[in-house]
């Protein structure tokens, strides 16, 4: 039996802001429990829902040196889906209205504390992992501290680490002097071949340099980040580590995302009866959002953070043109103010065609996946993307730009061979996107049989966590022996 510890800043169902939480909540329970004892460690945020806090059981506490002070570390645990979750408690660092704040140096101090506390807690918990699986820059100091401070202790000797990059754009950077003072790391670690990047300290870079293996969340993104366009300044380091770098696609939780058992949608359906049943979700959503009730009208869904990365500048450029077509567009998400206001404006201008829900709601997202005919994701870059996997699961055909995980998961429609599970375009160009949407409209309206055959294919593809878990298990066995 091999012991594995997942360390992350969020995880479903305890706390979630994005796709990282889905991975941390789903992957451990899909690993083979006959071979692995997998546990998860998270911060104990004050903003966790009360029902989640009620599940936590106090274990013990201790003090550790951090940022020139003796800091309190409280330990809690909970059982969820047969997995043990541990929580690091410190009210000074983890009391806030949201899991993350907008102050970069405070974030570095909080998650530097978390990284050191994770390692300090292990002997107290009596759990010695063979491997610690770290996620994103918030845990980037775990491999560094392990080598710098803990490796001399017999308990820690030989523990391996994996660093998973969910989005290379976020790296945890700040000036070296402040980071050195907070973390207590010596000058030795702040050189260009270690944590230093352009005269700043970079926590994700530290994790990539010191981890025994590096993964990211799709094979295409693993190749893209070795190039200057996608590499965010770390492409040279990632090329140097390419022997230990692999891309493993995320999956989705089929217990949560399955149209035949989804408690949020008015008309459940499956791969056999979707031709009759799926459309009932569309008419229900049209009524709920005040759109023109027309079951034949093509509905395009968007569920996303409203940011530049997601390609909303392309949509802004052609939205007026698109609204001249026989389509309805339903949007759910929050993000940059200009995009929130843009969708509010179009919802006002084209009230019977466009609905903008500027919020986040699990229930509405499920309703949009089920009701829409197509799902638009024109991302500038997309490490993996979960929304297109959910759309595929619900028989809603994705229209995507060929980048990262979108390229790996959506097979473009080929009318001559009768293959494909969606539509795609290659260049980051608004009119190329519009042409692709209009091509999809043409198939939807004029070749409905082909469209439905594509839905047959999308609903048969397996993007459950089972496949991804097998790939992770291969990597764990490579690092720590089967």
Label each residue range with its predicted role.
Residues 1-482:
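Catalytic cores of nucleotide-sugar-dependent glycosyltransferases that transfer UDP/GDP/TDP-activated
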């Amino acid at each position: 039996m091999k012991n594995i510890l997942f360390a992350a800043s969020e995880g479903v169902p305890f706390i979630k802001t994005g796709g990282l939480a889905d991975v941390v909540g789903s992957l451990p329970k899909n690993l083979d429990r006959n071979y692995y004892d997998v546990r998860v460690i998270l911060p104990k945020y004050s903003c966790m829902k009360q029902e989640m806090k009620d599940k936590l059981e106090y274990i013990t506490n201790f003090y550790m040196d951090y940022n020139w002070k003796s800091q309190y570390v409280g330990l809690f645990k909970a059982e969820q889906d047969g997995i043990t979750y541990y929580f690091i408690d410190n009210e000074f660092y983890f009391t806030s209205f949201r899991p993350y704040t907008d102050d970069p140096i405070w974030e570095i101090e909080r998650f530097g504390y978390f990284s050191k506390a994770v390692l300090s807690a292990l002997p107290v918990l009596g759990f010695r992992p063979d491997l610690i699986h770290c996620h994103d820059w918030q845990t980037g100091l775990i491999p560094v501290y392990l080598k710098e401070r803990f490796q001399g202790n017999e308990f820690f000797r030989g523990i391996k680490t994996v660093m998973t990059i969910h989005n290379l754009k976020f790296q945890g950077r700040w000036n070296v002097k402040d980071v050195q003072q907070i973390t207590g790391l010596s000058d030795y670690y702040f050189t260009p071949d270690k944590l230093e990047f352009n005269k700043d300290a970079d926590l994700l870079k530290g994790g990539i340099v010191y981890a025994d293996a590096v993964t990211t969340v799709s094979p295409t993104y693993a190749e893209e980040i070795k190039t200057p366009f996608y590499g965010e300044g770390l492409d040279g380091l990632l090329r140097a580590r390419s022997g230990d770098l692999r891309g493993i696609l995320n999956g989705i939780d089929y217990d949560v995302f399955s149209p035949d058992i989804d408690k949020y949608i008015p008309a459940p359906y499956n791969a056999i009866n979707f031709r009759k049943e799926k459309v009932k979700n569309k008419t229900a959503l049209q009524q709920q959002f005040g759109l023109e009730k027309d079951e034949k009208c093509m509905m395009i869904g968007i569920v996303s953070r409203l940011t530049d990365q997601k390609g909303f500048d392309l949509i802004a450029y052609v939205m007026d043109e698109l609204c001249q077509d026989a389509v309805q567009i339903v949007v759910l998400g929050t993000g940059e103010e200009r995009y929130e206001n843009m969708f509010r404006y179009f919802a006002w201008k084209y009230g019977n065609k466009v609905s903008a829900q500027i919020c986040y709601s699990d229930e509405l997202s499920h309703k949009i996946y089920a009701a829409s005919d197509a799902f638009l994701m024109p991302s500038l870059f997309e490490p993996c993307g979960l929304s297109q996997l959910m759309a595929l699961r619900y028989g809603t055909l994705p229209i995507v730009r060929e980048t990262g995980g979108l390229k790996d998961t959506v097979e473009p429609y080929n009318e001559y061979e009768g293959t494909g599970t969606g539509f795609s375009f290659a260049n980051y160009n608004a009119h190329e996107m519009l042409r692709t949407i209009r091509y999809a409209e043409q198939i939807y309206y004029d070749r409905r049989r082909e469209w439905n055959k594509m839905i047959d294919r999308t609903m048969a593809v397996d993007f459950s966590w089972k496949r991804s878990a097998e790939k992770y298990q291969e990597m764990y066995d490579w690092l720590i022996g089967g």
